[in-house]
Amino acid sequence: MPARRGDAHIDFARSPRPTIGVEWEFALVDAQTRDLSNEATAVIAEIGENPRVHKELLRNTVEVVSGICRTVPEAMEDLRQTLGPARRIVRDRGMELFCAGAHPFAQWTTQKLTDAPRYAELIKRTQWWGRQMLIWGVHVHVGISSPNKVMPIMTSLLNYYPHLLALSASSPWWTGVDTGYASNRAMMFQQLPTAGLPFQFQTWAEFEGFVYDQKKTGIIDHVDEVRWDIRPSPHLGTLEMRICDGVSNLHELAALVALTHCLVVDLDRRLEADESLPTMPPWHHQENKWRAARYGLDAVIILDADSNERLVTEDLDDVLNRLEPVARKLQCADELAAVADIPRHGASYQRQRRVAEEHDGDLRAVVDALVAELEI
């Protein structure tokens, strides 16, 4: 890549340890109608100044975040401490906390935007597609010690994209219609111009050059506006995994965070040992994303650059076995083992369809079931 001017440089904060942080997006639903409620501003105001609770694009959403944690159990306890008081306030106002990749029947046209310049600019630019972002997810940050590691790890992590999406898929419905997808959120979010799969850069300098070009051409004003499914967070010194659909409960959340933590640390340690990390062509990753979004746990995924294929759940078994020693060192062995519970009991998209069938298609029952899964 040609040399860039000095202002292309992006500082990376460097995390001395592979710490984790979790961002968990929740929707507010009316306790009676089970439709979305645009009351996040009032809820956040009542909670008061709290670095663990944030506003988001839409006024039906609150985001609960953990602090910087060393282990998955620590992160889950951190989230619990925030969720308990927050849910009491939400319930006192006649609402419930709800989390899935999408709401089963809400209409995007009735949702109000949060009053903030960056959100106004996003909608001004993206228009109809931006207004349709009625979606919720889970973001997991893992600390990386050097910018030189970020791009190789990010590129290799794409091999596990379908595993994480299939396990977390929780958005089969859109405005009352069964889309036929396990994760309609994955298909929706990539419509934003800076979202979707990341480019497979191998060096930090390539990423710096990309951001320079994006800023020079007016596509972004800040690096945070790069909304890839996996992206660096330079100011935090982390790699941020944004693949997962919204998760309704702490048990599955802990499992998915543990899987993410172990995958990143495993790749980091392999880099330290001068191993060459596995990669695949971008067209394989594009297909894997679509297959996982469409078929969920029934997806047959592409495994490697030689185009070998396998059922995602079969490959997941091998991944979990390989990561067991890593999980023990990271003190999340139980949480990693719980990943296997998701295929065993059914992923969220499967549970949602089951509930709808049992209630003659009444999607309010689906909301009830998802709300009930949040045990704090």
Curated annotation (Swiss-Prot):
Pfam families in the record: GCS2 (PF04107)
GO biological process terms held by the UniProt record: modified amino acid biosynthetic process
Catalytic reaction annotation: L-cysteine + L-glutamate + ATP = gamma-L-glutamyl-L-cysteine + ADP + phosphate + H(+)
Top-level lineage group: Bacteria
EC annotation from Swiss-Prot or TrEMBL: 6.3.2.2
EC class (word): ligase
A single MF term (Gene Ontology): ATP binding
Keywords: ATP-binding, Ligase, Nucleotide-binding
Its job: ATP-dependent carboxylate-amine ligase which exhibits weak glutamate--cysteine ligase activity.
Entry similarity comment: Belongs to the glutamate--cysteine ligase type 2 family. YbdK subfamily.
Protein name (record): Putative glutamate--cysteine ligase 2
